[in-house]
Amino acid sequence: MPEKPVLIAGPTASGKSALALRIAAEQGGVIVNADASQGYDCWRVLTARPAPDEERQTPHALYGHLNAKVRYSAGHWLRDVMPYLAGEARPIIVGGTGLYFTALTRGLADIPPTPAEIRAKGDRLERAEMLAALDARTRDRIDNANRARVQRAWEVQMATGRGLAAWQDETGAPALPLSAAQAIVFDVDKEVLNARIEKRFDLMLAAGALEEARRVLPDYDPTLPAHRAIGAPELIAHLKGQISLEAAREAAITATRQYAKRQRTWFRSKMRHWSAYMP
């Protein structure tokens, strides 16, 4: 019987993947992705997906398995992760998408699919417009700065006539109760994390992130979640001649730090019962 699954959550650039690799090397297991951006095949460098040699050393799953045009929700991820929970290899589930972990350990509401015409309308709206249309309970529950989360909540409300919070309150049993897992959440000092973010983005540029963005440029669509990966809009703007590379670098680092701040707030609010890990 495999040991309890390991869950590793934390903000971007905190060192989650390194810990997952170490656990897998010492104890075995399969590393399963729980980061929305790392699921897309158009990015490896920019989203800090595991390197090819790391993937050869240890089994990895749900990395780069999605075409950029695919709309992928927490429900899709939960469906895809289920075989690894039932498999013989111990799953080491690692990532920074808090909603995935919440769906896994607290359950997911059975919300009807969103009609294509409603999604298309949402793609054309500004985040603030959609946010203003949400009920107060839903606004209080989601990350108001995350466009994907705001649009998802707006789509649910438009399609069903009910707020996302109301649907979530009817959530069924979780696939993996927290008591059945070894749950670790990274708690990294803000200044340390900010320095790591800057250093990592410079390493990404050196490793080919700009070339990655150049390959995406002909098909770039800012309405696609895949193309809203942190750093992508900034590098695309540079490639279009709108800003300098240095300005793109600074904007991407700022955006990453803002994202990390939102992640840390989420984790501290939603993962109080997880074991804190301070690298």
Curated annotation (Swiss-Prot):
EC number(s) per entry: 2.5.1.75
Keywords: ATP-binding, Magnesium, Nucleotide-binding, Transferase, tRNA processing
Membrane recorded as keyword: no
Positions bound to substrate: 12-17
Entry keyword annotation includes 4Fe-4S: no
UniProt enzyme class: transferase
Organism, as annotated: Roseobacter denitrificans (strain ATCC 33942 / OCh 114)
Protein known as: tRNA dimethylallyltransferase
Cofactor list: Mg(2+)
Function: Catalyzes the transfer of a dimethylallyl group onto the adenine at position 37 in tRNAs that read codons beginning with uridine, leading to the formation of N6-(dimethylallyl)adenosine (i(6)A).
A biological process term (GO) from this entry: tRNA modification
GO molecular function: ATP binding; tRNA dimethylallyltransferase activity
Gene3D superfamilies per record: 1.10.20.140, P-loop containing nucleotide triphosphate hydrolases (3.40.50.300)
Catalytic activity field: adenosine(37) in tRNA + dimethylallyl diphosphate = N(6)-dimethylallyladenosine(37) in tRNA + diphosphate
Binding site for ATP: 10-17
Site-annotated residues for Interaction with substrate tRNA: 97
Xref: InterPro entries: Dimethylallyltransferase, IPT, P-loop_NTPase
Record text on subunit structure and interactions: Monomer.
Family: Belongs to the IPP transferase family.
